[in-house]
Amino acid sequence: MEQYTIKFNQINHKLTDLRSLNIDHLYAYQFEKIALIGGNGTGKTTLLNMIAQKTKPESGTVETNGEIQYFEQLNMDVENDFNTLDGSLMSELHIPMHTTDSMSGGEKAKYKLANVISNYSPILLLDEPTNHLDKIGKDYLNNILKYYYGTLIIVSHDRALIDQIADTIWDIQEDGTIRVFKGNYTQYQNQYEQEQLEQQRKYEQYISEKQRLSQASKAKRNQAQQMAQASSKQKNKSIAPDRLSASKEKGTVEKAAQKQAKHIEKRMEHLEEVEKPQSYHEFNFPQNKIYDIHNNYPIIAQNLTLVKGSQKLLTQVRFQIPYGKNIALVGANGVGKTTLLEAIYHQIEGIDCSPKVQMAYYRQLAYEDMRDVSLLQYLMDETDSSESFSRAILNNLGLNEALERSCNVLSGGERTKLSLAVLFSTKANMLILDEPTNFLDIKTLEALEMFMNKYPGIILFTSHDTRFVKHVSDKKWELTGQSIHDIT
């Protein structure tokens, strides 16, 4: 008999006023590789925290059999302790053996991942492990997880990764229950789409039959009413003997029509109700009017050299940033992408910028700096927007259920959505986005793609999501060998 390592029993846990986790019984088994999926704010991280004993469910119990290693989503704090890590692992992941304070976001993620993987446990929990990781890091993670000997539960919006790793899908539904599917992500998506199509067919059939019966009942009621009116008129007249039988026949027909109408209505009552297929809220980021620039190349770099600590990142580089284009900066962790974005934003020596350029900057770890105020208050304060306008923006992003929640308890995806909403509410004509896709669910990613493709100004961004880069970039600049190469 297969041995379980995790057991949920009668869980009920409130997430927001309108959303909760509701799990009757759920098991994770030894050697099972589970992808936990669901939209931002549906409780994925909360579920992992319950397993790791960091969050206690309001009712119900979570049992675990075995030690747990947990890669947490929002905790990017790392210690300067290289002695506990395998040197070959550090080399394989290209993690520099210097102080963690000077590491990039991607290098910190690799270091933290190496810490978790170096210590084997029979239960491994990974919450968005690919955020900040370059191709080297993702490939390494993929290989490790393929041969991991234990129970794995992974939360990731990296569809390629979970497709290759997972043999079981846990999908958090709108009602807070969890649907379990045996198979990989693509198989689950295909089955789900077929089920939605079949549900739509049954729903349309149900509505059509309901309308047909309703019309038939109405027709019989009308027929009975007309017969009753005809009988009433005849009663007010002197009825000849030869018309008496005709009057009785009308009464009989009227009763028959009434009886048929009641029979049809009973059929309607006993008609098995079919629910409408679940439809998803379409997300939209705010699209403000921006200050236009009549300058083909409003930002120019001449002989730019960038140094971080003792490491030289760029040497005597030149580039021009064209107006109205989306430019992706790509390259391995630690090559200087974030440092270059900061240099451009602060317009350091070597970078000439038109005075008409107005920049807005989304920093890679922006989600760490939010104040302990409600979502609604944060957006109003950061954008000087009215309450009604702020409510409309949050509703468009599917955050209407969390208006009064503190920013400190939001999921990574919810924090990222909020940060981007603040940024996009400005009139900036240049957006600098450092890893904006981290934590975002698929629907929000699509909304971000739509926004970026419509944005009339400059967008300079970084992302390790190759599919996203392909969909939104006009140009690709690769940072390598202390230089920048256009690889569009």
From Swiss-Prot:
According to the entry, every stretch annotated as the ABC transporter domain falls at 6-199, 299-487
Please state what the annotation says regarding this protein's domains: Composed of two homologous domains.
The superkingdom listed in its UniProt entry is: Bacteria
Q: Which residues lie within the region annotated Q-linker, rich in Glu and hydrophilic AA?
A: 200-298
Family assignment? Belongs to the ABC transporter superfamily.
Q: Where is this region: Disordered?
A: 211-255
* Name of this protein: Erythromycin resistance ATP-binding protein MsrA
Point to the regions of Low complexity compositional bias: 222-233
**What InterPro entries does the record tag this protein with?**
AAA+_ATPase (IPR003593), ABC_transporter-like_ATP-bd (IPR003439), ABC_transporter-like_CS (IPR017871), ABCF_EF3_subfamily (IPR050611), P-loop_NTPase (IPR027417), PAS (IPR000014)
